[in-house]
Regions:
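Short amphipathic alpha-helix segments
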Residues: 7-27
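Helix N-cap motif at beta-to-alpha junctions
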Residues: 9-13, 42-50
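Short amphipathic alpha-helices in soluble, non-transmembrane regions
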Residues: 19-21, 51-60
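RNA-recognition motif
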Residues: 30-36
């Protein structure tokens, strides 16, 4: 499991979910609003966390 906080101006959650599920077909993504500028994004079901971090790092 990996949880990060991302700014909406960087990427929206639905697009990030699509990118991650294309790269990791077993991934399950959830998110929740923190405020109008940020959301908390969590990914489950990915074994290669280093590669997942590389993908997410582009949007943090």
């Amino acid at each position: 499991m990996k949880t990060v906080i991302i700014e909406y101006s960087t990427i929206i959650p639905n697009v990030l979910k699509k990118i991650i599920t294309n790269a990791f077909p077993t991934a399950i993504c959830t998110w929740k609003d923190l405020d109008e500028d940020y959301f908390e994004f969590t990914v489950f079901g990915v074994l290669d966390l280093a590669m997942l971090e590389d993908v997410i790092a582009e949007y943090m």
